Amino acid sequence: MIKMILADDEPVITRGIRKLIDWEQLGIQIIGEYEDGKSAFAAILRDQPEIALLDISMPGMSGVDIIRECHGLQCKTHIIFISGFQEFEYAKAALDYGATDYLLKPVIREELLKAIEKCVKSPEQPGVTYKGNIDFSGDAGEQEQIYVPVCVYPMFCRSEKEQ
């Protein structure tokens, strides 16, 4: 199984992402959820997940700080950012340090699947350790509608068809 962590200072977002996709069907195990950057960074160092799905703006340590430190330590974790910030500087900094992808909130399920696929199928990236055959062409399992407050729901569970 591929190990992945989630980090966002809004727990409803991490819970929603957990329920958005049938991760187990993709061969991915979510091994931790974190609400601040320091805890997420400690988990990356301690658990060495193949994938870290991070909010770019968190208390304690920003996502850019995390990827900068990971880059300096030559961590093998693929980092995907999820952010409400559309400023070019955030995306540029993230990509300069080797982020696999930078997704804007509201996260679109299909875009998240494509970002995860990049992590799993990208041999030039040092973090790929999974040798199995994962099928990303399907729907990764149909999910029932997730109950979250109406004001937050659109932030993480739209599909491309709804745009």
Q: Predicted regions span which residues?
A:
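Acidic catalytic/metal-coordinating carboxylates
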Residues: 36-39, 62-65, 83
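Two-component/phosphorelay signaling modules centered on CheY-like receiver
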Residues: 11-32
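Interdomain helical linkers/hinges and coiled-coil/dimerization scaffolds
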Residues: 93-95, 99-163
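As written
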Residues: 49, 63, 75-76, 95-100
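Active-site residues of response regulator receiver
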Residues: 8, 55
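Acidic, metal-coordinating helix/loop segments flanking the phosphotransfer/catalytic sites
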Residues: 33-51
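Receiver (REC) domain active-site loop signature in two-component systems and cognate sites
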Residues: 58
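Short amphipathic alpha-helix used as the core "switch/output" element in two-component signaling
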Residues: 42, 64-75
